[in-house]
Amino acid sequence: MQGACISESQPWYLHFVCFIGFLFLLRVLFIPLLKWFTTRFLLTPKRLKRYGSWAMVTGATEGIGRAFAHELAKHGLNLILVSRNLSKLESVSDDFQQEFPHIKIKIIPFDFSSEGGYGAIEEGIKGLEVGILINNVGITYPRAMFFHEVDQLTWTKILRVNLEATTWVTRSLIGPMLHRRRGAIVNISSGAAVVVPSHPLYAIYAATKAYVDALSRSLHVEYKQFGIDVQCQVPLYVSTRMVSEVAAIDKPSLFVPSPEVYAKAAVAQIGIGSRCSPFWAHSLQWFLVGLVPDNLVDTWRLSIGLRRRSLS
């Protein structure tokens, strides 16, 4: 008994429509699921120390950055911690040194939102074999705002921290990595720029994170041949102070991991592909959002932004 789509009595254009439908399902369902299964269960996490003995983490005193640094220390990597608050840096360094007495830790106090140059970072990493860079530092709006409501100081700081800092730090470390022909660079983007088609009332933030995504994916293609793995990681909500302030999410849940849970998944994905959403529930959300028409997602995101604006 023949199915409707392959019956010889059916007009040719029905066969064509069935074929197009098959290609659509292949593209939308099968290939993403196969890629997800392969990266989660078949590919072995890379041995991180092969990239080099030091790892540098920006925005390292709290949230995802601190958790990243802690996870890298578990792998025996020496740490360069960069953040603007010296006292917090010293506190984190002391905590890590007690827990991991066998590693070396260097702290660099630096405010990425300032107008000054990056000489302090250049001096701080001089002579060190930095094999892994985690470009984690990032800021967003203090509250949901229309584009015309964002003051110049706010959007200037967002551009400096999210865009300029990522570019500069990547540029400063990729040269030595190229000389050694090994290294890993992880740039943290956001679901606001990659997973959803728009992020109303946070437009500048989303635009900077879209830049991070495009930069990372292009650099992945450029430098893979030289042994440098450049990767864009795309988190959705993680239970951090910034997310608490923006989205009023103050504790972990099934779809909102703690920084520690997220970082464990994120470190395991270093060097595997040009772009990923490391936490399993985030990647599931990404897949499901991709099945919804963009205009519906846009309407949903706008309603969320307007509600947050009314409450601020």
Curated annotation (Swiss-Prot):
Keywords: Endoplasmic reticulum, Membrane, NADP, Oxidoreductase, Transmembrane, Transmembrane helix. Its EC number is 1.-.-.-. The chain crosses the membrane at residues 14-34. InterPro entries: NAD(P)-bd_dom_sf, Sc_DH/Rdtase_CS, SDR_fam, VLCFA-Steroid_DH. One of its GO terms (molecular function) is ketoreductase activity. It is a single-pass membrane protein. It comes from the Eukaryota. NADP(+) binds at residues 52-81. CDD domains: 17beta-HSD1_like_SDR_c (cd05356). Expressed in green siliques, flowers, inflorescence stems and leaves. Not detected in roots. Disruption phenotype: No visible phenotype. Pfam families: adh_short. GO terms for cellular component: endoplasmic reticulum; endoplasmic reticulum membrane. Substrate binds at residue 190. The keyword Membrane applies. It is found in: Endoplasmic reticulum membrane. The active site is at residue 205. It is an enzyme of class 1 (oxidoreductase). The keyword Membrane applies. Probable reductase, but unlike KCR1, has no beta-ketoacyl-coenzyme A reductase activity. Belongs to the short-chain dehydrogenases/reductases (SDR) family. This is Very-long-chain 3-oxoacyl-CoA reductase-like protein At1g24470. The gene is KCR2.
